[in-house]
Amino acid sequence: MKRTMLYLSLLAVSCSVSAAKYPVLTESSPEKAGFNVERLNQMDRWISQQVDVGYPSVNLLIIKDNQIVYRKAWGAAKKYDGSVLMEQPVKATTGTLYDLASNTKMYATNFALQKLMSEGKLHPDDRIAKYIPGFADSPNDTIKGKNTLRISDLLHHSGGFPADPQYPNKAVAGALYSQDKGQTLEMIKRTPLEYQPGSKHIYSDVDYMLLGFIVESVTGQPLDRYVEESIYRPLGLTHTVFNPLLKGFKPQQIAATELNGNTRDGVIHFPNIRTSTLWGQVHDEKAFYSMGGVSGHAGLFSNTGDIAVLMQTMLNGGGYGDVQLFNAETVKMFTTSSKEDATFGLGWRVNGNATMTPTFGTLASPQTYGHTGWTGTVTVIDPVNHMTIVMLSNKPHSPVADPQKNPNMFESGQLPIATYGWVVDQVYAALKQK
């Protein structure tokens, strides 16, 4: 009920010009912000070494006290054509767009929900069935709970859904198979719960697929149109989009991902599977095949400059410049740890205990929150140190280490940099050793 009381205290606001004036990002130097430049140079050399031994590319941006103090790119946005190394790779720049993977959950779906809740159009205790007609238990369900499932259950990843039903893969999904957005919603409704809602936290893409559909139900717009017109455009963001190739971007502006489509170097097969190098299309299978590239759980592309503004909006308490998206009470509600698991906020992952060290390192404050993405992305927002870090990369743009043993382990994923906390710790160490 604590979250409900917090919600009731929110003031309805609109994403329009507000009387509030929020900090905007400016450029500064690491020295002026209190960083040890030699420690940052050591980090630079370490990242370069990781790229030299096979990590595809990295973009890193650091904000301290409302100032961008570090921004750099390493490696190649595309260096493979299929399994063959290119003679002339496409170099990564600080403007390169990356497939955000599950960071979509935060910077599209959560931002939309935070705005809608701040406006009083949604409540965390609303039942899913209020917005998704036909969402209910069936007589044959072994585990019931859909009838009373709430938005907050999905945000907490405690709704009972399996982690990944693999809807586009008929051999795995069986009767839940779908490669059509409308049909996918029906398959989600039929997806059996695996545990009693509210009894534990199991991270699930299905939760955010449903939340994306709820945003569309409330706004009457496709998810991509709503966030692009009502969130990104007011903030002046021009490089944060779903389906970038359909919206004026060229492949050369985007980091490539998997070498041989979604086949994991030839060991995965299902109807319509892509087999050529993924370049400008979302990697995630459910987002691409089952949702047309636009889903609440994956599909968003962006660069570090745009993500910096979105992270600063969170740090500011819901606004940027003259634009207010939501208020500080909403930010607090979404980033407060669950009573059952201190690492889960409402969607946001929180640095609540040592299990989050691979994401946030060992030096970030316990109040730090953010998210990761399967393609090699991490965002870190630390309100105590007033610092944010975004690292974008294209980790799957390398061969699979052993397709037969583990088709989801890429060679690049075995490098230390694939554990984001290593990079995060080096940033904090540079700040703490002036």
UniProtKB/Swiss-Prot annotation:
Primary location class: membrane
Catalytic activity reported: Preferential cleavage: (Ac)2-L-Lys-D-Ala-|-D-Ala. Also transpeptidation of peptidyl-alanyl moieties that are N-acyl substituents of D-alanine
SUPFAM superfamilies registered for this protein in UniProt: beta-lactamase/transpeptidase-like (SSF56601)
PROSITE patterns: PROKAR_LIPOPROTEIN (PS51257)
GO cellular component: plasma membrane
Alphabetized UniProt keyword annotations: Carboxypeptidase, Cell inner membrane, Cell membrane, Hydrolase, Membrane, Protease, Transmembrane, Transmembrane helix
Single annotated GO MF: penicillin binding
Cellular location(s): Cell inner membrane
Cysteine disulfide partners in this protein: none
Transmembrane residue ranges: 7-25
Topological relation to the membrane, as annotated: Single-pass membrane protein
Pfam families: Beta-lactamase
NCBIfam families listed in its UniProt record: PRK03642.1 (NF002968)
Name this polypeptide is given: Putative D-alanyl-D-alanine carboxypeptidase
Organism: Escherichia coli (strain K12)
Gene assigned in the entry: yfeW
